[in-house]
């Protein structure tokens, strides 16, 4: 019994350290995000009216104010284009999204990217900084880079969460 308690205690300490080691990037070249991105995988702890978890990103545009504009493609009966504005904050890797249908604001935080192949982001509820969802986007449909980094980030989500694996045939192709 003592051995079991010791094992559980050590596992918890390891999990806490793993969570602390995953931070968002310190700097971000937002101009390098311009272009198309495809949703590879997403995980969320709740349902959102934010379409970001069901869509490919047709374009990422940089506004003159330094904000990001996402042009999204949602697949319903057909592919429909929608726009979402991410307002810059004091932190270079974080943007604010206000969703009027939810009367809520979220922080869009870029966790990891190599700019050429993949980027990982998480959404936080602004009021309590609780991580609500994370997603893995890639530049090319067949790309899988960033998968290990995404799995590490998933370990930081509150339980339970739902993982959505995207099939390329279900995507709106840009």
Curated annotation (Swiss-Prot):
- One Gene Ontology CC term in the entry: extracellular region
> Which residues does UniProt assign to the signal peptide?
1-18
Superkingdom per UniProt: Eukaryota
Kindly give the Pfam families that the UniProt entry links to this protein: Lipocalin
What the entry lists under Gene3D superfamilies is as follows: 2.40.128.20
Keywords from the UniProt entry: Disulfide bond, Milk protein, Retinol-binding, Secreted, Signal, Transport
What terms describe the molecular function in GO for this protein? retinol binding
Q: List the disulfide bonds.
A: 79-172, 122-134
Which SUPFAM superfamilies does its entry note? Lipocalins
> Where can this protein be found?
Secreted
UniProt function note:
Lactoglobulin is the primary component of whey, it binds retinol and is probably involved in the transport of that molecule.
Quaternary form?
Monomer.
Q: Which family does it belong to?
A: Belongs to the calycin superfamily. Lipocalin family.
Which named protein is this?
Beta-lactoglobulin
Gene that produces this protein: LGB
């Amino acid at each position: 019994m003592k051995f079991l308690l010791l094992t559980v205690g050590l596992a918890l300490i390891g999990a806490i350290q793993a969570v602390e080691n995953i931070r968002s990037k310190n700097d971000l070249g937002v101009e390098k995000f311009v272009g198309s991105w495809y949703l590879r995988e997403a995980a969320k702890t709740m349902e959102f009216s934010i379409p970001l978890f069901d869509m490919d990103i047709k374009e990422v545009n940089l506004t003159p104010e330094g904000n990001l504009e996402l042009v999204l493609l949602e697949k319903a009966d057909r592919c429909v284009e929608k726009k979402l504005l991410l307002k810059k904050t004091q932190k270079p890797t974080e943007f604010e999204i206000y969703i009027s249908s939810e009367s809520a604001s979220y922080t869009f935080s870029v966790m990891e990217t190599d700019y050429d192949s993949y980027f990982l982001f998480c959404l936080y509820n602004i009021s309590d900084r609780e991580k609500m969802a994370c997603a893995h986007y890639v530049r090319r449909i067949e790309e899988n880079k960033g998968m290990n980094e995404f799995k590490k980030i998933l370990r930081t989500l509150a339980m339970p969460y739902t993982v959505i694996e995207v099939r390329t045939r279900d995507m709106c192709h840009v």
